[in-house]
């Protein structure tokens, strides 16, 4: 039975917050302030809070009281959802009060709140195409990211004309909490951050709005300072997996080409997800002099990964620091490995921490950001022949075996499927050679098979992408060169 939209939304706000029935008129006027009184007589069949919020926005657009640009609607939508979101002080008090007796419950409650108030965009994330496919490195995870809407040309034009602002300094800064937003900076009225201490300094814990995996979290420094991989990084990651049980924690590398998209603010990512790299076995055990108590091995993975395990955090940090320092200064001309050129460093590490079976675990992924005439985008970066699938930097998430592929592939891959079935002769030029190869390999392909064939090929290409990003190749020569670096570490003081 249809009910009044505003009244139903207000009822849901009261049920999901500390507002009471006496606050109904006040809340109704809050809603009118945001979306206009022109929505007063609209009816709804829904009782789901986020659906009701979306209906209010659309009614406001129709009435002319809400702008047509998605960015304008997001600003108002976040304010509507802020009505059910406790103040930051309450969020933090509730989190740490619960944490004292049940850390897992404290985390679960904060995650539930972040979904309930639409900060984590559950409906948008559900639009992503996601699947697993077998490769010689195990099952890789493929996602075509459709959750983040592409910019409307009108929004791009409006952003160009917007008054310049450097507040907040970036999208990770603490000052985003409760920030209204603008045409070129996301709405954050319903954003909340849990504060915690590391090294007697304030850090923030939040969820990623457009999550790439389960409980995708961000842990960021309270001050706007650039990313830097150092001994402190290893200690912080191991502290995070201790403080937030069940979560892994990792850092993007701190150099261009091999780093993430935000290098200007010190932050780490984590969450409750088992990535393909985590379940990959050890290709060859190695040992480090003076660290017989630390289990170590080269991981069977397309990228160059050393895995360290110990019950003692301090020992892991000490060995990881030694490996980092050695890698930063290590060159091997025959292997194509160069520590620096013209004073510019090329070497860093992408580190990932976990706590498993009573032990701490560190995966150290060796990175090299050299470029050359042949590979101007990066020698250890997706090469030209696979850039039709993935040309962006290989950051932390891809390193671990989860491909984040661009939205364009949704339609482009459908065109490739049609081409293989003989139902279309048009594919994007960047895919033509690949489509012809698939057609030659599968001359009698059926409609029942075609999606799986294309998806499997995409996964195989992603495995190749990771091989390109790997400093040491996965053949016997590459393994010998990798072990030569291990020997170098053992010779170092």
UniProtKB/Swiss-Prot annotation:
GO terms for cellular component: cytoplasm. The keyword Transferase applies. It catalyses: alpha-D-galactose 1-phosphate + UDP-alpha-D-glucose = alpha-D-glucose 1-phosphate + UDP-alpha-D-galactose. It is an enzyme of class 2 (transferase). One of its GO terms (biological process) is galactose metabolic process. The keyword Zinc does not apply. It comes from the Bacteria. Pfam families: GalP_UDP_tr_C (PF02744), GalP_UDP_transf (PF01087). Keywords: Carbohydrate metabolism, Cytoplasm, Galactose metabolism, Nucleotidyltransferase, Transferase. One of its GO terms (molecular function) is UDP-glucose:hexose-1-phosphate uridylyltransferase activity. PROSITE patterns: GAL_P_UDP_TRANSF_II (PS01163). Transmembrane segments: none annotated. Its main location: cytoplasm. Belongs to the galactose-1-phosphate uridylyltransferase type 2 family. HAMAP family: GalP_UDP_trans. This is Galactose-1-phosphate uridylyltransferase. It comes from Streptococcus thermophilus. The lineage of its organism: Bacteria, Bacillati, Bacillota, Bacilli, Lactobacillales.
């Amino acid at each position: 039975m249809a009910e009044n939209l505003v009244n139903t939304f207000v009822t849901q706000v009261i049920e999901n917050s500390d507002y009471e029935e006496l606050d109904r008129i006040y809340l109704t006027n809050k809603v009118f302030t945001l979306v206009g009184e022109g929505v007063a007589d609209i009816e709804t069949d829904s009782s789901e809070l986020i659906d009701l919020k979306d209906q209010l926005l659309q009614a406001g657009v129709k009435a002319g009281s809400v702008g047509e640009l998605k960015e304008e609607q997001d600003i108002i939508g976040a304010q509507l959802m802020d009505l059910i979101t406790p103040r930051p002080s309450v969020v933090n008090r509730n989190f740490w009060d619960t944490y004292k007796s049940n850390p897992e419950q404290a985390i679960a409650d904060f995650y539930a709140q972040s979904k309930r108030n639409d900060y984590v965009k559950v409906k948008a994330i559900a639009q992503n195409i996601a699947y697993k496919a077998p490769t010689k490195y195990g099952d890789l995870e493929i996602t075509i990211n459709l959750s983040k809407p592409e910019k409307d040309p009108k929004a791009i034009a409006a952003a160009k004309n917007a008054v310049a602002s450097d507040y907040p300094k970036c999208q990770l800064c603490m000052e985003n909490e409760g920030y209204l937003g603008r045409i070129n900076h996301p709405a954050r009225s319903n954003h909340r951050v849990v504060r915690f201490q590391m090294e007697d300094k304030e850090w923030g814990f939040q969820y990623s709005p457009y999550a790439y995996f389960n409980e995708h979290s961000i842990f960021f420094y309270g001050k706007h300072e650039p990313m830097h991989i150092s001994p402190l990084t290893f200690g912080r990651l191991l502290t995070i997996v201790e403080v937030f049980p069940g979560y892994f924690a990792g850092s993007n590398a701190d150099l261009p080409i091999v780093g993430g998209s935000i290098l200007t603010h010190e932050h780490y990512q984590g969450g409750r997800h088992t990535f393909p790299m985590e379940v990959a076995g050890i290709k060859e055990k190695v040992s480090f002099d003076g660290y017989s108590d630390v289990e170590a091995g080269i991981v069977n993975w397309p990228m160059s990964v050393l895995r360290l395990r110990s019950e003692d955090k301090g020992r892991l940090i000490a060995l990881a620091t030694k490996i980092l320092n050695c890698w930063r200064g290590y060159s091997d001309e025959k292997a194509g490995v160069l520590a620096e050129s013209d004073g510019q460093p090329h070497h860093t590490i992408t580190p990932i921490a976990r706590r498993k079976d009573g032990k701490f675990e560190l995966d150290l992924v060796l990175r090299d950001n050299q470029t050359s005439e042949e590979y101007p985008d990066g020698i250890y970066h997706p090469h030209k022949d696979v850039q039709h699938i993935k040309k962006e930097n290989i950051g932390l998430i891809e390193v671990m075996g989860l491909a984040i592929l661009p939205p364009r592939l949704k339609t482009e891959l459908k065109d490739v499927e049609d081409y293989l079935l003989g139902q279309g002769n048009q594919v994007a030029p960047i895919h033509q050679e690949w489509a012809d190869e698939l057609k030659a390999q599968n001359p009698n392909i059926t409609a029942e098979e075609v999606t799986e064939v294309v998806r499997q090929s995409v996964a195989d290409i992603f495995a190749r992408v990771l091989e390109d990003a790997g400093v040491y190749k996965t053949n016997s020569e590459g393994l010998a060169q990798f072990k030569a670096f291990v020997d170098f570490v053992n010779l170092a003081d």
